[in-house]
Design a protein with these regions (language model features):
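N-proximal low-complexity "stem/linker" segments adjacent to membrane-targeting elements
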Residues: 46-87
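Short, acidic, metal-binding catalytic loop of nucleotide-sugar glycosyltransferases
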Residues: 91-102
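Active-site-proximal specificity loops/subdomain of glycosyltransferases
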Residues: 108-152
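Short beta-strand-to-loop acidic/aromatic patch adjacent to the donor-nucleotide binding site
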Residues: 151-164
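Conserved catalytic core of nucleotide-sugar-dependent glycosyltransferases
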Residues: 161-242
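C-terminal functional extensions of proteins
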Residues: 524-591
Length: 591
């Protein structure tokens, strides 16, 4: 491997076979599991696998009546000092100039190039060069779309990408009517005489080299700030899927509908030594019609998951049907599995119960003073999964699941029911759409949370937190659950639980549904409320973000959300809402 300085860009000659082989196993197997999750994800891999990306399979598009707006291609052209690489880039530009279905090409360059440098014999009326004097960012693209008053279908593509006649199909994809973006996987062009011979880049099916949307989908100046990172930098494609998603775009990757071609036989890379854009990252695997359809219980698509949750809750409430939605927790899930096996008198199980008991007290607030108490906790925890129709589950490569792979499989195997993606509860990702909580319209909603005082102080300004009211026409009430985590004192968990359930029973006629955030008591409280004839949803720690009460976890993991929504109504929890030793709970993640 060697490096060289090229036109202010560091290029690296790489063994791409090695790079692809390091990643291909995960992408092939995760695609297989997404398409047909008929066995344990971990057994498929033979190990616990973690990915920093969320993975989903693209939905298919419908065919719409043709809307004949202009197709505008935006790229940044540059002159590479490696002749072979420069020839590849010139070839792509020439192909795009000759494409009769591309109406305009905007080149946002670091300098203005001559026709010879562009690889053109004569000036093309299609091309407009603008000297932006720097490497192109996605934010720049939106600025120039507005500045040039561009209207129509925008195709943003890397320099080494060219399109064929299938770009005409974009006019029947509904982009002008819907807030939707195509994030397209490429075909590899290696000098083939017939483009039909080019194959998809299935070694990394989650990558994108072109993004297509319509200017009717407005991106506000504040939203444009979310795209303030360079094109071509490592991770930019998966970051862009995430940003489009949280701005309300339905993301599609349909490479056989609209084809893009990658001309890169030189294998010169300009980003491998350039760091990586900070996450989160979304990987959208392509929809290919001749592959098995994704299992509808495992879409992991925030648009579809939010809508499915919204519709389920709305349907239940409209029919006055009592329901609960528990969730797979973390350390509590492990304890539920170990406690379930307690009667076997297995020494290994007994040792694990004893080993996990301190963490149960510290993180989940559950004091287990004997192995028999663990068995009782397990029975109550698992009863929630028996009583529900659906429950929340993590994607199996999630950072949380690596700590609970056995108990994760235990729940899925013993409760083969439809699931919601737990991250559908991240309400801040669904603000531009119809957040699932709006299905609660007009209901009496009980909020169970340790941040009762903080929430109560924001009821009258709740529509300012995200710019919409997450609980329209709702009558909100609040109750604080047992505060027994960290160094706070606690009685045995069942004593704390019984006392709290009596408090809930005494007010059961004052609410229609409860949203729960109460540590290790969450699933147990949901099950108990169901027995009272009340509905409940175990939302978990993220419930505090519904009221703009944030902690370290969201500052760390969701910086884009803060950039987009944070305002003077947001706050930390009140000092009185911190348990003793709160910093010992995942670094004080809730505070």
């Amino acid at each position: 491997m060697f490096t060289m300085k090229l036109n202010n860009r560091t290029a690296t000659k790489v063994n791409t076979e090695l790079v692809d082989n390091r990643s291909i196993d995960f992408y092939v197997k995760s695609r297989h599991w997404l398409s047909n999750p008929n066995k344990s994800f971990f057994k498929l891999f033979g190990q616990v696998v973690e990915s920093e990306n969320r993975h989903q399979i693209s939905p298919p598009s419908k065919v719409y009546d043709k809307v004949k707006d202009k197709v505008i291609l935006i790229q940044q052209f540059y002159v590479d000092k490696i002749p072979h690489r420069h020839t590849e880039n010139k070839f792509c530009l020439k192909q795009n100039v000759n494409n009769k279905f591309i109406d305009k090409i905007i080149l946002l360059n670091e300098e203005i190039y001559t026709n010879e440098q562009l690889g053109l014999k004569t000036q093309s009326s299609k091309i407009q060069q603008i000297n932006i004097k720097t490497r192109l960012t996605y934010k720049d693209v939106f600025y120039y779309i507005n500045n040039l008053n561009l209207k129509g279908y925008i195709v943003l593509a890397n320099t080494d990408i060219f399109l064929d006649d299938t770009i005409e199909r974009v006019k029947q994809t509904g982009l002008s009517q819907e807030r939707k973006v195509f994030c397209q996987l490429r075909h590899e062009y290696n000098g083939e005489k017939q483009l039909s011979s080019c194959t998809l880049h299935l070694n990394r099916p989650d990558t994108q080299d072109a993004w297509i949307w319509h200017t009717n989908s407005i991106v506000t100046p504040k939203q444009q700030e979310m795209f303030d990172y360079r094109m071509g930098k490592n991770g930019c494609d998966n970051k862009t899927v995430y940003v489009f998603s949280i701005l309300g775009f339905a993301c599609h990757n349909e490479p056989t509908i609209i084809k893009i071609y990658h001309n890169h036989t030189s294998q010169i890379r300009n980003y491998l030594n350039d760091g990586k854009i900070p996450g989160p990252y979304y990987s959208i695997h392509p929809f290919v019609s001749n592959m098995p359809p994704p299992n509808n219980l495992n879409t992991f698509d925030i648009v579809r998951e939010n809508q499915t949750l919204h519709n389920y809750v709305l349907g239940k409430l409209e029919k006055n049907q009592v329901f609960i939605i528990p969730r797979i927790a973390s350390v509590e899930n492990n304890m539920a599995m170990y406690g379930n096996y307690y009667n076997n008198q297995n020494k290994d199980i007994l040792n694990k119960i004893r080993a996990w008991a301190p963490t149960m007290k510290k993180n989940a607030g559950i004091l287990l003073n004997s192995e028999a108490a663990a068995a009782k906790y397990s029975k109550l925890y698992l009863s929630a999964f028996n009583k529900c129709e659906r429950y929340f589950s993590w994607e199996p490569w999630n950072n949380y699941v690596k700590h609970i792979p056995d108990s994760f499989d235990f729940i899925l195997a013993n409760f083969p029911k439809p699931k919601f993606d737990t991250l559908a509860l991240d309400i801040f990702h669904s603000i531009p759409r119809e957040p699932w909580t709006r299905a609660l319209r007009g209901k009496r909603v009980l909020i169970i949370s340790p941040f009762k005082e903080s929430f109560e102080s924001k009821v009258h300004i709740r529509e300012k937190i995200y710019g919409i009211d997450l609980f329209p026409d709702c009558e909100l009430s609040f109750i604080k659950p047992p505060q027994t985590q960290a160094d706070n004192p606690s009685r045995p968990f069942d004593v704390e639980l019984d006392e709290f359930m009596k408090r809930l029973y005494n007010i059961k006629d004052t609410f229609d549904i409860a949203l729960c955030s109460c540590g290790g008591y969450g699933n147990l409280v949901c099950a108990g409320l169901f027995d009272m004839g009340k509905s409940a949803i175990y939302v978990g720690g993220v419930l505090q973000m519904y009221f703009g009460v944030y902690g370290q976890r969201w500052l760390r993991d969701r910086p884009d959300v803060f950039k987009l929504y944070r305002n003077d109504t947001w706050s930390r929890p009140k000092p009185s809402e911190r348990p003793q030793g709160f910093a010992s709970i995942e670094g004080g993640c809730y505070w």
